[in-house]
Amino acid sequence: MMLEAAGRRVHVIQGEFKVVNDPDVVLSTILGSCVAACMRDPVSGVGGMNHFLLPGSSTSPASAGDATRYGVHLMELLINGLLKQGARRDRLEAKIFGGAKTIARFSNVGEQNAAFARQFLLDEGIRVVGESTGGEHGRKLEYWPVTGRARQYALTGVEAQRAIHQDQRPAPAPKPVESSIEFF
C-alpha cells in the first residue's frame, strides 16, 4: 500500500466506484479514454469516484458482467453509494476527468464518454464544478473526496501506453454469487 504524507491512497480501477468519508483518503486512478466522475456532498463530508470504459445507455441490455464497464451503471452506483452514506442529492457537486483520444485510428470514445458524463449530470441536476477532459494524453488522477481537491498529471511515454492498455482491457469478471448453481 502506498502512503502519502497526508493520507491513505485507494486506487479505483476500470469498472469500479469508491465512496469514502475519511479525510485522510485520496482516491486515485489512471485514465486514457475512460472517464472518472468525482462527486461529493460538501456538507456531509462524503465523496467518491467511479471509472467507466463506455457510456452505455439505459436501453442497451448489459449482462451482469458487462454492466460495470458502462457509465450509466457506474454513475447510478456512485450516486446511490453517496446517498447511503448521508449525502443529499441537492448538494452533490461533480468533477469530470479523462476522455482522451489515445488511439487516433479508433472512433473517439473518450469524447463520447465525457459528453455522456456531462449530460448525465445535467439531467440529474448535479452541478459540475470542474472538468478536464479530452486531449491526446492519458491522466493520472488524485481526488480527495471529503475536500473536493483534485490533482492530475499528464501521462506520456510508457505511462501513456500503460493507460491505453488498461482502457482496452475488459473489466474484471464479476465474482460468482454464492447461491449460484453450477452445472457439470
From Swiss-Prot:
The lineage of its organism: Bacteria, Pseudomonadati, Pseudomonadota, Alphaproteobacteria, Hyphomicrobiales. Its EC number is 3.5.1.44. This is Probable chemoreceptor glutamine deamidase CheD. It comes from Sinorhizobium fredii (strain NBRC 101917 / NGR234). The keyword Nucleotide-binding does not apply. Gene3D superfamilies: 3.30.1330.200. It is an enzyme of class 3 (hydrolase). Keywords: Chemotaxis, Hydrolase. Pfam families: CheD. It catalyses: L-glutaminyl-[protein] + H2O = L-glutamyl-[protein] + NH4(+). Residues 165-184 are annotated as: Disordered. The keyword Hydrolase applies. The gene is cheD. Probably deamidates glutamine residues to glutamate on methyl-accepting chemotaxis receptors (MCPs), playing an important role in chemotaxis. Belongs to the CheD family. GO terms for biological process: chemotaxis. InterPro entries: CheD-like_sf (IPR038592), Chemorcpt_Glu_NH3ase_CheD (IPR005659), Cytotoxic_necrot_fac-like_cat (IPR011324). It comes from the Bacteria. GO terms for molecular function: protein-glutamine glutaminase activity.
